[in-house]
């Protein structure tokens, strides 16, 4: 049995205002990839922040409300299924992360991103008086478990996307979106074959392309 990899405590960069960024929804066959950026208030701490996947749905929902109430700033960013099909899921995710940071009403001077790569984040030209000035950034492997700002971002992104799937389920209950959240489960694949491909599906993803007859090895 392989031993579980242990990551050291994260050493924060020297910065005045740090934003954490995470994504949810790279794997599903349907809907936007959703990202979030969060700047926490050190004078208004939030207990229980951790990787959103390790929290119950009830706890995630409560923490999402608390994060939005207590954070200095938070923002959601998205990339549509059409953008995913055009750019591919990696580049669409990077675009959504950029949109999340751009949506913050306070500009950070450092951005920490979950994972092993991060996009380029540009300063607001009107504030910096310099075009194409980059915001410092760093990718953090397992950041959603090691960096509280990223944990907070993972929580509000997860809650936002799950709510979107619940809303989609009300429009198309025959697909079971509230249950599988768009992921390629056996049930979901059966429903696609039975009912067809909606406009909100990612047509470049293999299981969807196979149903459409557009997939080629």
UniProtKB/Swiss-Prot annotation:
Localization per Swiss-Prot or TrEMBL: Cytoplasm
Gene3D superfamilies, alphabetized: Ribonuclease H-like superfamily/Ribonuclease H
GO cellular component: cytoplasm; ribonuclease H2 complex
Location, primary (coarse class): cytoplasm
Cofactor: Mn(2+); Mg(2+)
Cofactor binding note from Swiss-Prot or TrEMBL: Manganese or magnesium. Binds 1 divalent metal ion per monomer in the absence of substrate. May bind a second metal ion after substrate binding.
KW Cytoplasm (keyword) present: yes
Domain RNase H type-2 intervals: 16-217
Keywords from the named record: Cytoplasm, Endonuclease, Hydrolase, Manganese, Metal-binding, Nuclease
SUPFAM superfamilies: Ribonuclease H-like
Catalytic activity, as annotated: Endonucleolytic cleavage to 5'-phosphomonoester
Purpose of the protein: Endonuclease that specifically degrades the RNA of RNA-DNA hybrids.
Name of the featured protein: Ribonuclease HII
Species per Swiss-Prot/TrEMBL record: Colwellia psychrerythraea (strain 34H / ATCC BAA-681)
Annotated gene: rnhB
């Amino acid at each position: 049995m392989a031993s579980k990899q242990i990551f050291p405590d994260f050493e924060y960069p020297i910065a005045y205002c740090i934003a954490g960024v995470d994504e949810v929804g790279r794997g599903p066959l349907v809907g936007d990839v959703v990202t979030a950026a969060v700047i926490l208030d050190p004078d208004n701490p939030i207990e229980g922040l951790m990787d959103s996947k390790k929290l119950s749905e009830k706890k995630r929902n409560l923490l999402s409300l608390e994060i939005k109430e207590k954070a200095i700033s938070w923002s959601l960013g998205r990339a549509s299924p059409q953008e995913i099909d055009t750019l591919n899921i990696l580049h669409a995710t990077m675009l959504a992360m950029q949109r999340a940071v751009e949506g913050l009403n306070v500009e950070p001077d450092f951005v920490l991103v979950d994972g092993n790569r991060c996009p380029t984040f540009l300063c607001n030209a009107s504030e910096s008086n310099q075009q194409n000035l980059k915001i410092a950034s760093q990718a953090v492997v397992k950041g959603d478990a090691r960096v509280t700002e990223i944990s907070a971002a993972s929580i509000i992104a997860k809650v936002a996307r799950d709510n979107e799937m619940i809303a989609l389920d009300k429009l198309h209950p025959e697909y079971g979106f509230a249950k599988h959240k768009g992921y390629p489960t056996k049930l979901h694949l059966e429903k696609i074959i039975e009912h067809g491909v909606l406009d909100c599906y990612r047509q470049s993803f293999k299981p969807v392309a196979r149903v459409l007859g557009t997939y080629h090895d």
